[in-house]
Amino acid sequence: MKKIIVSLALASVLLSCKSTVATSNKQEEVKVTIDLIDVKDDKVQVTILAPKINSDQITYSIPKIIPGTYSNDNYGRYIDDLKAFDNKGTLLEVKKTDENTWTIPAAKKLYKITYLVNDTFDSEKGAGFGQEDIFSPAGTNIEVGTNFMVNMHGFVGYFQDKKEIPYRVSITHPETLWGATSMIDLDSKNNSDEFVVSRY
């Protein structure tokens, strides 16, 4: 059976971070799940389990600029339907403060964030990279049955003052997809991959 390639282009954000191995000591981390199985309307769902937050409010941001391109690409414009929940599944208030940032006032209650990601390839209209279009190698692509280009800065953001803690990223996918990445997959299953990095 022909293999379908899922391109996990982790270079921009996560590849620049040091890989780490899981330890037996429980430590603070951000847990991320990217669902490449249940794709609807060309959008991928991302779930972020929040670390312990002691502040009264917290911001969650998707990058505006990434190393290597240095253009104002505003990856937050590709995020839809961002929601925050407490540990009982109750919706928390979320305020979008700019194109790339969301503020959660009841931060101490925050358990998880969910949102949908659109890909950048579909939005390229020939306006030019650094204008309205995003430089393709730094972009994201969602083509069910063909490929996914998962540049992490287009899928995963960061909490204010929490960029220096580890990230555990789990990607669920059909068994016919395999990930092309230089990172070490800590999950041996055929339908999921897991990567751990020391910081955002």
Task: Annotate each predicted stretch with a short phrase.
Residues M1-E29:
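Bacterial Sec-dependent N-terminal signal peptides
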Residues V21-D38, I48:
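Non-catalytic, glycine-rich low-complexity segments
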Residues V30-I34, Q45-T47, T97-T101, N151-F155:
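Short structured motifs
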Residues L36-I37, G68-I134, F159:
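A surface-exposed beta-strand-loop module
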Residues V44-G76, V156-P174:
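Surface-exposed beta-strand/loop patches in extracellular or lumenal glycoproteins
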Residues P51-Q57, N87-T90, P105-L110, T172-T176:
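A short, structured loop/turn motif at beta-sheet edges
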Residues T114-Y200:
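Extended, low-hydrophobicity, Ser/Thr/Pro/Gly-biased non-transmembrane segments
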